[in-house]
């Protein structure tokens, strides 16, 4: 994110929402199943994400230099752009050029520096925050549950000075399977419901230190087994709804 608004509570929430942006839509969870077999994981592959409601989010990603070593081990270059806005505020935009490595279902990202070196990515618009692959074991029935999780996002200090952001998700419970419309047509998908709490932290924008209050949301991930992906995430925070979904992939 190149510029961060600094006007009061909205700025604080915009900053944190930009970092969380769908916590389970592209890998904030430690284990990501099926990433190497995703529909876009090939040379020329593409994925597009769009958000609406309180959080407006867009991401256009292109995949190249893809290599697969079998199992859930692969590498790819990910290039594209992302933008995030909150409550009608102007979108913050970032250009992305990352090298992604997946080993045993866990993805890590490195940024290419001007001199050709690779530097680990810890924040900025971290692709692990986008989470299409958050369920590492098969979902087989209504009532199935997944344990609570805790993960930490380390903010890229080249973008903004901030303490690590701690995110906790409650126990996840699978609801009744339903047919929903996705970018890949009608799909029979499982709704997985849980709470997500972002712990209070603080951030410094251009030398101004702002406390960021804790935020709790009710979240529903729509996991579509035929695609092995979360294709849509719906969340509700203080009565305001947001949706982030995959709108295109090839």
Residue ranges and their predicted role:
Residues 1-12:
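N-terminal secretory signal peptides that target proteins for export/translocation
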Residues 12-22:
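Sec-dependent N-terminal signal peptides
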Residues 28-29:
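N-terminal signal peptide c-region/cleavage motif recognized by signal peptidases
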Residues 34-118, 155-250:
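Acidic, serine/threonine-rich low-complexity disordered tracts
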Residues 78-80, 125-127, 146-148, 173:
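Extended beta-sheet lipid-handling architectures
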Residues 120-131, 184:
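Acidic/charged, solvent-exposed loop-and-adjacent secondary-structure segments enriched in E/D, K/R, S/T
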Residues 146-157:
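Membrane-interacting alpha-helical segments
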């Amino acid at each position: 994110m190149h510029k961060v608004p600094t006007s009061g509570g909205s700025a604080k929430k915009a900053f944190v929402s930009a970092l969380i942006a769908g916590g389970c839509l592209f890998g904030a969870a430690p284990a990501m199943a099926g990433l190497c077999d995703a529909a876009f994981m090939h040379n020329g592959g593409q994925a597009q994400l769009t958000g609406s409601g309180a959080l407006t989010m867009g991401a256009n990603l292109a995949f190249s230099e893809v290599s697969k070593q079998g199992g859930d081990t692969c590498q790819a270059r990910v290039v594209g752009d992302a933008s995030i806005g909150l409550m009608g505020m102007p979108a913050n935009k970032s250009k992305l050029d990352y090298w992604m490595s997946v080993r045993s279902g866990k993805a890590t990202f490195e940024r290419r520096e001007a001199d050709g070196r690779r530097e680990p990515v810890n924040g900025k618009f971290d692709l692990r925050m986008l989470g299409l692959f958050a369920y590492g074991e098969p979902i087989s029935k209504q009532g199935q549950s997944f344990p609570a999780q805790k993960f930490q996002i380390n903010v890229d200090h080249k973008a903004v000075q901030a303490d690590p952001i701690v995110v906790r998700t409650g126990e996840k419970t699978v609801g009744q399977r339903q047919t929903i419309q996705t970018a890949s047509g009608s799909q029979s998908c499982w709704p997985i419901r849980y709470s997500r709490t972002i712990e209070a932290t603080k951030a410094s924008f251009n030398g101004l230190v702002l406390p960021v209050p804790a935020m709790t949301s009710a979240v529903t991930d729509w996991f579509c087994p035929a695609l092995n992906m979360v294709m849509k995430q719906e969340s509700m925070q203080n009565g305001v709804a947001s949706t982030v979904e995959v709108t295109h992939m090839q």
